[in-house]
């Protein structure tokens, strides 16, 4: 699936947006898309954390080359980092905290 999270940074000023747009060329002219900023600090932090988990992936992770090739990321000596499992753990921990509060 295509990410619909946009993060723009300028020094300490970070802006986060969510969007329905995936910017696939086949969709640009045939759809109405919406993008909106995230103002809530906690939601913004959570979205950035989620994005960073994805960047760390090195198990079955793919990179898109400048030649539009869909290549596996080489892990080398790095410890395996399974982004989907880490994402599950991330939100499971948040759920436990929320459950304790309630």
Short names for language-model regions:
Residues 1-102:
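PLD/PLD-like phosphodiesterase catalytic module centered on the HKD motif
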């Amino acid at each position: 699936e295509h990410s619909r999270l946009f993060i723009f940074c300028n020094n300490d000023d970070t802006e986060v947006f969510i969007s329905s747009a995936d910017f696939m060329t086949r969709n640009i002219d045939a759809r109405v898309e919406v993008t909106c900023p995230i103002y809530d600090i906690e939601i913004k932090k959570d979205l950035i954390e989620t994005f960073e988990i994805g960047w760390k992936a090195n198990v079955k992770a793919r990179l898109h080359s400048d030649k539009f090739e869909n290549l596996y990321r080489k892990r080398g000596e790095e410890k395996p980092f399974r982004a989907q499992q880490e994402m599950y753990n991330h939100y499971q921990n948040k759920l436990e905290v929320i459950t304790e509060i309630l």
